[in-house]
Amino acid sequence: MVGGVGYGSASSFKSATAGNINLKINVAGSSTTIFNANTSVAENKYYSVYMFDSTFNLKVSIFEDDRTPPPSGKANVRFLHLFVGGPAVDIVRAGGSTKLFTFRSYQDHVGNTALTAYTAIDPGPFSCAAVVSGTNFSVSQLPAFDASTGKSYTLVLRGFNNAVPLTPEYVKLVPVEDL
């Protein structure tokens, strides 16, 4: 059981017995269930569960994680587009034109698990931007964070197309350390 995970936050991996499990999500501090589904998990595997969209239109993405360490002297990043109503984007390294991920659309990883694969990067200060695909128009800029050697990160573009700026629901590109 995982509790107290607020909007935009993450928890560590939790163990589960292999086989069929029930995944239930309640509104924080209540017994009101907003998601309830059965899924199957395999022995000795890791899975990520992402919840997104609004409370009453909740979407959940569950996928198996590749826990292979990054290549020697590198860090790993992958990208999830969970920006409700957002355009297709490219993820571009700051200070250059290197595209790490191209033409990524809302929830595209759901039908294509290859889109949850990691890309190796040099460790150290890491910054990038989500830009409308094929343009330089910035949707969101990720402030620099320290990508550590041997660690893996998921870059999540989240938020709502019509959210008020500076609110938690406004579009934001955030790093999640995959523990």
Indicate residue ranges for each PLM-predicted region.
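Intrinsically disordered, low-complexity polar regions and short flexible loop motifs
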Residues: 1-179
